[in-house]
Amino acid sequence: MPFSRLFGKKEKNQMDDIDNIVEEGVQRVQELPMDKIFPNQFQPRTVFDQDKIDELARTIRIHGVIQPIVVREMEPDYYEIIAGERRFRAVLSLEMEKIPAIIQNLDDEEVAAIALIENLQREELTPIEEAKAYRSLLDMQEVTQEALAQRVGKSQSAIANKMRLLKLPETVQEAVLNKQISERHARSLLALETEEQQVALLAEIAENHWNVKQTEARIQEILGVKKPVATKKTKPKRQAISRDVRIAMNTIKQSVTMVKDNGMDLDFTEEETDDFYQITIQIPKKK
């Protein structure tokens, strides 16, 4: 079955594609031994919410497994999970010996794609899990970033930006994976030149509980970027100087007018240059 079944068409919904592939050639539901089933090697999720699994287990204890898991046979009587790992983990926690399953014949590319899309649609992945899943699919060389973006409902730039997180040191990736720092924190660390700087700043973020804005400010310090001097700070000074000059000029002119009104014949001239105002007052010695 070609990988294009999932990534070659635009008009169908992602989950419809998965359901159609799973339904095609569906065999009857079988009860498979739990010890003959192993997790999906392409499972993008590396951290499972144990509280949610426990909640699911309580539901299964009362109602049973309503929706069978989907598997593929890897060796005679050994099966890999395609979809339903949370159900498998919940049943495992209940120490049940068997689980209802549907066996499908899918290749690696289709299994990887289904695992990614199922998680994106049904439960949020961490940014690192999502990035690694994208890389896994692209490394199979069966799909372009653009085609992948169309099928998972993302923009090509969103996928590219997500994958940039994989350029960070493993220590930083683990911090994102474990939700010790946010994706925005991690993105800001990409501005630093070396892994040593990135790991060192990660420690500072944890120690000081910095938010993203504080982290970005610290990065500017590390990079030696000087903040531009705000022009607004100098405007009041220039305005004050201009205002003082006008007051001085008006005061002089008023004084000259007052003297003229008292009968004194004055010759008043003013000249403006780039650097100063020049005022000349000539007072005749004789009337």
Swiss-Prot record:
GO terms for biological process: chromosome segregation; division septum assembly; positive regulation of sporulation resulting in formation of a cellular spore. SUPFAM superfamilies: KorB DNA-binding domain-like (SSF109709), ParB/Sulfiredoxin (SSF110849). GO terms for molecular function: DNA binding. It is found in: Cytoplasm, Nucleoid. Keywords: Cell cycle, Cell division, Cytoplasm, DNA-binding, Septation. GO terms for cellular component: chromosome; cytoplasm; nucleoid. Coiled coil: none annotated. Disulfide bonds: none annotated. The keyword Translocase does not apply. InterPro entries: Chromosome_partition/occlusion, HTH_ParB/Spo0J, Nucleoid_occlusion_protein, ParB/RepB/Spo0J, ParB/Sulfiredoxin_dom, ParB/Sulfiredoxin_sf. Residues 146-165 bind DNA. HAMAP family: ParB_Noc. Effects nucleoid occlusion by binding relatively nonspecifically to DNA and preventing the assembly of the division machinery in the vicinity of the nucleoid, especially under conditions that disturb the cell cycle. It helps to coordinate cell division and chromosome segregation by preventing the formation of the Z ring through the nucleoid, which would cause chromosome breakage. Belongs to the ParB family. This is Nucleoid occlusion protein. It comes from Listeria monocytogenes serotype 4a (strain HCC23). The gene is noc.
